[in-house]
Amino acid sequence: MAETTEFELVSPERLLFSEPVEMVVVPGTDGDFGAMPRHAPLLSTVRPGVISTYNGGKVQRRIFVAGGFAEVTEDRCTVLADEAFDLASLSEEAVRARLQAADDRLKEATSEAEKAEAAQAKAIAEALLAARKG
């Protein structure tokens, strides 16, 4: 049996899941990185993108995160995600509705802060749609 590391995904509301994995690939701000058992300690910011977990040499789960932070130790990888979506259970219609809502907010925004927030929401929705298709 292959050696595993514990992967935890945490949202602001709750622990989304915790499971043993052979490897997890995280979209770090400076590039994707893989965490495996006995990994050197690492802290990283996480950009919007897809986290992939591996077991048996195959992708087990793909989760889109909207950003956050990751901590890797020799026996654990914890991602604190701003938002997280399991791509296997997310419909394209739901993603398109999210993108449309973000686009509408951007068109209606009046202050610079509203525009920046709406633009970020739209960029995340576009990345989520691309991840859902890919």
From Swiss-Prot:
One of its GO terms (molecular function) is ATP binding. SUPFAM superfamilies: Epsilon subunit of F1F0-ATP synthase N-terminal domain. CDD domains: F1-ATPase_delta. It is found in: Cell inner membrane. It comes from the Bacteria. Transmembrane segments: none annotated. The keyword Nucleotide-binding does not apply. One of its GO terms (cellular component) is plasma membrane. It is a peripheral membrane protein. Its main location: membrane. Keywords: ATP synthesis, Cell inner membrane, Cell membrane, CF(1), Hydrogen ion transport, Ion transport, Membrane, Transport. F-type ATPases have 2 components, CF(1) - the catalytic core - and CF(0) - the membrane proton channel. CF(1) has five subunits: alpha(3), beta(3), gamma(1), delta(1), epsilon(1). CF(0) has three main subunits: a, b and c. HAMAP family: ATP_synth_epsil_bac. Produces ATP from ADP in the presence of a proton gradient across the membrane. Belongs to the ATPase epsilon chain family. This is ATP synthase epsilon chain.
